[in-house]
Structure formats: structure tokens, C-alpha cells
A protein has these predicted regions:
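Short, low-complexity N-terminal intrinsically disordered segments enriched in polar/charged residues
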Residues: 1-47, 88, 150-155
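C-terminal-biased regions
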Residues: 2-10, 16, 75, 98, ...
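Surface-exposed, charged secondary-structure patches
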Residues: 20, 49, 64-109
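Short beta-strand segments enriched in hydrophobic/aromatic residues
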Residues: 44, 101-103, 137-140
Length: 155
């Protein structure tokens, strides 16, 4: 039996996948802004490995990833999150992407924070026809001389 996908070229499939991947990251942004852990849970593999800017060196599994976001949400009354310059390289069932991202908002104590721009890398897997984040890494540049992260750069 022939399906519509049988007639798609590889280029067409990659273009469709890139649209799906961008929508997926848009859902991450929406979930963060809404502080919706249930929505975020649907966007990651159960065995996600996350290298985030705060300790420990890695967060392994969806529970650890969500616990990390829950800690952030406890600090913020309202969350703003933006992604810039998102780029993907797409295969049939694996893709990777990179972008700049910034978390900002109003803290529970009423103070506002402009946040800091970070570099983010996504490792994506297509499982049962759905793209999921299997790995993410968030980082800031390091000033070698001082040994401190540089957090005042902008894209």
C-alpha cells in the first residue's frame, strides 16, 4: 500500500521535520512560560540527559529534568523565555539543534530579572513519529583567566 509519505523526497521530509522540531521547541517555550511541568514532561524522552548551568554536572531522566525546572519555577512569579537563532540539522530519526536562550521574569520577591543569554544545544530523537528531546546542554562562555562564566553577552 502506498502512502503520501512514499512520494516525499528526502528534502521534503527534512523540511517537514524541521517545522516539527521548531514547533516542538515552541512548546518548550510555552511550557516554561506557563510553568507547566506536565506539558514539559511530554517533550522529553524518559531517559533524557541534561547538562544544565546549575549543579550537578548532569540531570539524568525525566524526573531529574522536571525537578530542575520545578526549582526554577519556585523562584519565579512569572517566567519569560525566549529562543533566538535556532538551527537544526535533521536526519530520519535523529536531529540536533543549537540556539541562544534567555530565562527572565519576575521573582517571587517582586524583583525583576533580565536573565542571561545562554547557549543551548538539543539532541532530538523521533520515537513513534514524535520528536522528543533526548539531550540538552546549556552553557555560558568561560573567562579562562578568572575561571568565571561570562553572563553579560548578548546574541
Amino acid at each position: 500500500m502506498t502512502t503520501p509519505n512514499d512520494f516525499q523526497t528526502r528534502t521534503d521530509r527534512i523540511e517537514v521535520a524541521e517545522v516539527e522540531l521548531r514547533r516542538h521547541i515552541d512548546k518548550v517555550v510555552e511550557g516554561l512560560r506557563a510553568k507547566d511541568l506536565d506539558a514539559l514532561k511530554q517533550l522529553y524522552t524518559t531517559d533524557v540527559v541534561s547538562f544544565d548551568v546549575e549543579p550537578p554536572l548532569q540531570h539524568v531522566g525525566i524526573a531529574a529534568k522536571l525537578e530542575n525546572w520545578a526549582k526554577v519555577f519556585m523562584l519565579f512569579e512569572s517566567v519569560a523565555y525566549e529562543v533566538r537563532d535556532l538551527t537544526f540539522t535533521v536526519g530520519d530519526d535523529v536531529a540536533f539543534g543549537h540556539a541562544f536562550a534567555r530565562l527572565s521574569g519576575t521573582l517571587k520577591n517582586g524583583a525583576t530579572t533580565g536573565g542571561m543569554w545562554v547557549r543551548v544545544t538539543y539532541g532530538m530523537r523521533k520515537i513513534d513519529d514524535t520528536w522528543l528531546i533526548a539531550h540538552d546542554q546549556v552553557s555560558v562562555p568561560l573567562d579562562i583567566a578568572s575561571g568565571k562564566g561570562v553572563v553579560d553577552l548578548e546574541p
